[in-house]
Amino acid sequence: MKIRVGSRESKLAVRQAQIVIDSIKKYNPDIEIELVTMKTTGDKILDKTIDKIGGKGLFVKELDRALLDGKVDITVHSFKDMPMDIDDRLPIVAVSKREDPRDVLVLPKGKNEIDFNGPIGCSSSRRKIQIEKIYPGCTVEPIRGNVLTRLEKLDKGEYSAIALAYAGLKRLGLEERIWRVFSTDEIVPAACQGIIAVQARKDFDASILANFHDKDSWDVSVAERSFIKALNGGCSSPSAAYGVIQGEKIVLTGFYVDKNGKIYKMTKTGDRNQGEALGYSLAMEMLKGADA
């Protein structure tokens, strides 16, 4: 049996695909696996922010097409980069155990404090708004490109610091670059940050991913994505959600910024098997507060 695994071309995307491949091979040593990488539209357009070029769908369109055309059997994604509406023909068939979900700040090589005369680079309004709260008066500017490209721009002196996801740096073996780790209270992470998602066609036998799949990650991802979807939040809309499993419950924290720039943050607990309802009800409560 041969499985073709589709991935974006970046070093981090390939590393994440390799994590999935290693798990499949560990439990199914007879399966032959081929990695197929491709550049997505989102990888090609680097001079505009995500919301200006059509949102998260631009990072999955080519991978979805390859799946539908039968060119690959599964695709591997950072779950946080996937659009809220997923093609019914291409379900998520497995998710990884969650890596550290926190956001971090990285300084240029050789520096050990932020020079506030220069901008802090970050890729989403979610991070921007929360960083401006932590460092009042700082300048935050957009940054695009994969993790290594962003680090290159930082080290060239284009930014005084950049905000990134802990998980990406850890998977790339670049943890030593981390200068400050923000708690999930200081910066609420993007929904599903730190989780790898595997997508396939409906007829795919996902049993080869049974040992890879993590139920805790799945349950919190359902709640987090439900919250964002209820707010109509795409990639750069200022919203975030972070769920933690406590026994049979999920404690879900939602973050939302209304059109006037007012920040709302609320936590709600619900049954772990009712994540969709929990995310939706938290979003409705926050929108009610925003309309009041």
UniProtKB/Swiss-Prot annotation:
Pathway: Porphyrin-containing compound metabolism; protoporphyrin-IX biosynthesis; coproporphyrinogen-III from 5-aminolevulinate: step 2/4. The modification S-(dipyrrolylmethanemethyl)cysteine is found at C235. Its EC number is 2.5.1.61. Pfam families: Porphobil_deam (PF01379), Porphobil_deamC (PF03900). Belongs to the HMBS family. This is Porphobilinogen deaminase. It comes from the Bacteria. It is an enzyme of class 2 (transferase). Tetrapolymerization of the monopyrrole PBG into the hydroxymethylbilane pre-uroporphyrinogen in several discrete steps. Keywords: Porphyrin biosynthesis, Transferase. The gene is hemC. The porphobilinogen subunits are added to the dipyrromethane group. One of its GO terms (cellular component) is cytoplasm. Binds 1 dipyrromethane group covalently. The keyword Transferase applies. CDD domains: PBP2_PBGD_2. Monomer. One of its GO terms (molecular function) is hydroxymethylbilane synthase activity. It comes from Acetivibrio thermocellus (strain ATCC 27405 / DSM 1237 / JCM 9322 / NBRC 103400 / NCIMB 10682 / NRRL B-4536 / VPI 7372) (Clostridium thermocellum). GO terms for biological process: protoporphyrinogen IX biosynthetic process.
